[in-house]
Amino acid sequence: MPHGPLTVGSLTAEPGEKRYGVNEFPIDGKPYRLPMWLVNGRADGPTLVVTAGVHPAEYASIAAALEFGQMLDAAKVRGRVIVVPVMNLPAFTARSIYICPLDGKNLNRVFPGSASGTASEQIAAWVFENVMKRGDYFVDLHGGDLIEALVPFTIFYRTGETRVDDASLAMAKAFGIPILVSSETPGSTFSSASKAAIPAILAEAGGQGIWKADAVRAHTQGLTRLMRHLKMRSGGPPKPVRCRLLSKFQWLRSAHDGFWYPAVAVGARVRKGQELGRVTDWEGRVSQIAISPSAGQVLFIVSSLAINRTDPLLAVGV
């Protein structure tokens, strides 16, 4: 793209300028506030879009996006960076798990959204059209929610378009988290970006409502490594990290309301047919035994004793 002003909504950053501001746009007739940084480097280069807070209680990723936005220096950036630290602000202030309180929907299941849809669909549509489509590359930062424990991993989506897929895989490797997962989550940020020919990844680190320094660092260091990979900052290519590529992401869900007792630890290697945990009814009688559908690695576990029908229990990467 030609080097010039960087504009998103009502905010503009001139070349060599870093600007923080809040975009406002109507959602169901009421003003919706979206804070962001625009960093327009002095030297030309690609545009990187970074978002967090799609799932608003994944605090390590939000803290990392805040830190990353604060540390960026336009004088040292080649290209442009857009950072949205908390996309789902109403859910963040409500300390909500998974869903947006405006309509009860999971924002990361409705992309690319609809301008005439529900509140979450309208938010997704504005962000997709005005923020994500401005980028040459896209990163969405996540982690375990308030009731999820996980091992760090990075997801990318294979679209079948070689240029996009190769670039997304290279981004995932450059980010530096050793576990990579090839997966499509319908309605997600990263798969919607990839389908729009924007190479994209979703990085996971942290969880359970805690923002530990190592989880925040996994995200901020990953973003710094990625910028070096994209030649957006000095330092040369990042040192390669030996990665394990998983081709599937298998979720197990509860068939009942009740209590959840995991039988394995997050990160554990499991075999096909192995018992992974049990769901009991209110009396404590076993109503479901969760069995691993494949040999693989446990990537996340719901850490809440309380479980509802259709809730995720855990996921196995294969």
Q: Positions of the model-derived regions?
A:
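Structured catalytic-domain cores with a bias toward divalent-metal coordination
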Residues: 1-318
